[in-house]
Amino acid sequence: MTYRDFIGRLKENGKLVEIQQPVSPIFEASRIAKKTKGPVLFHNVSGSKVIMNLLGSRDELSSMLGVPKEEIIKKLSEVSPEGEVRLVPGSPTLEVIESEVDLTKLPILTHFEKDGAPYITAGIVVSEYEGVMNASIHRLMLVGKDKLAARLVPPRHTYLLHKKAAEKGETLPVAIVLGCDPTIIYATSTRVPAGKEFEYAAALRGTPVEVFECSNGIKVPHSEIILEGYIDTKERVDEGPFVDITGTYDMVRKEPVIHITRIIHRKDPIYHGILPAGPEHLLMMGVPYEPRIYRAVGEVTTVKNVVLTEGGCCYLHAVVQIEKQTEGDAKNAIMAAFAAHTSLKHVVVVDEDINIFDPNDVEFAIATRVKGDMDILTITNVRGSSLDPRGASDGTTTKVGIDATKVLIEKENFERAIIPEE
């Protein structure tokens, strides 16, 4: 399914809000996207089309994957990154070629009052060095007509490729993809073996991913917009402030500069923007960890489902549903979840009769099945998330696991009343 096909399906299903009147890229588009929550297509942001909240809910992920919402994580946990990638000679992305680079002509958004600059938030940075390729989403701060500052997180793959090239005095060629097949957007948000992002996307959608070669040799999928360039060897600038998944400002750091040398795009391209700390940002950060937790818990007990909750920024809080068979199962599940996602701060384990997508049902389990001195596991001075405002300066935190499952020998005490159907 193409990017435009997916947008068309949203429209056909009545799930796309369209804004025809002019909208400012400074705060206004973000303000509307935050209020709308669902997919919203702006037809005139500084004369350009912009879509936000494209994959902003599990309903959109369900549509993308072709499975019910409750089966998303089971599906993702079963897919291996072994799909087919095909190199093709041309692309609709080549409809317009701009050698005179001016990034300010793009509808790059300013989202919050203290943002360091306008930010590209949905750019997939594709890089390759010495035969090793990577594709991943990075926040990109506008610092000039042909320059972007990229937040490269150590020790992730783009950071390592740039480090390796810089140590040899060489620039790292990159191509920044904006607006492509949603399965590719998801695949490049997750953790797969180096260079397997496009293969994973192909496996997810069940059809090959076509790529074409940019002028700098980087191979990219068909997209709305491609920014070709390179990451400078030594040049660094202040990057930030920027709002991260907790809705608070991340710190300002010295980060590498990407020089853009050419822009190619579709006619009348649809720019993709992700609202920082918005629903799409949360899902793209969190959902890729759910299959990892699912598989890890499955090694120690019978796992039924996993969710990283919206209230926990889809990153810091998890609810794990198991089929409990022994009294140790829930605590084993807690430890497995923490091992699978080291940024996880709090985890709740529940039984099969609890709807993990309903916060009230999860709270009911905690209220009626937890005895504080027996069912709460506290682990101090362990690695946490750099995104947690309450974490220590050395990156450590305290983690809490809650066993909100029934006591097996007293199961009848926890039976929930049912009104029979007629």
Swiss-Prot record:
Mn(2+) binds at N134, E197. Its EC number is 4.1.1.126. The keyword DNA repair does not apply. GO terms for molecular function: 4-hydroxybenzoate decarboxylase activity; metal ion binding. InterPro entries: UbiD, UbiD-like_C, UbiD-like_N, UbiD_Rift_dom. Keywords: Decarboxylase, Flavoprotein, FMN, Isoprene biosynthesis, Lyase, Manganese, Metal-binding. SUPFAM superfamilies: FMN-binding split barrel, UbiD C-terminal domain-like. Gene3D superfamilies: UbiD C-terminal domain-like. Catalyzes the conversion of trans-anhydromevalonate 5-phosphate (tAHMP) into isopentenyl phosphate. Involved in the archaeal mevalonate (MVA) pathway, which provides fundamental precursors for isoprenoid biosynthesis, such as isopentenyl diphosphate (IPP) and dimethylallyl diphosphate (DMAPP). This is Anhydromevalonate phosphate decarboxylase. It comes from Methanosarcina mazei (strain ATCC BAA-159 / DSM 3647 / Goe1 / Go1 / JCM 11833 / OCM 88) (Methanosarcina frisia).
